[in-house]
Amino acid sequence: MAWKPRRDATEAFDPLCYYLPPDAISIETAISRVVYVNGCYMPEDEAQISIFDRGFLFGDAIYEVCLVIRGQLIDNQGHLRRLTRSLGEVDIEAPLSMDEIVSVQRELIAKNDLDEGLVYLQ
């Protein structure tokens, strides 16, 4: 599967912005079946968030969507830098260290047997 620079008549060329062909990721592989919530791995249908959660009450949230190809996170260091910067901008403390976040990402990839898809951090 080849990465191609995104470029069409309506947008300027940005060498750091890429897209995958439409058939590269199917909906089935993009949806996780095992999630990580509040320190626990669980089936997605068991995941719950407290009604007192600040993100739920006030909409405070930072997220990153990380691409997985052949079971590997693509440009994960870039995602982690942006995550760190974004958390700092809104004064939210990271619940885990960056090394722990990477461990969770890798465990989610393994638990979901994810070859191609997405890992969504929020």
PLM features per residue range, with description:
Residues 2-122:
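Conserved alpha/beta cores of soluble small-molecule-handling proteins
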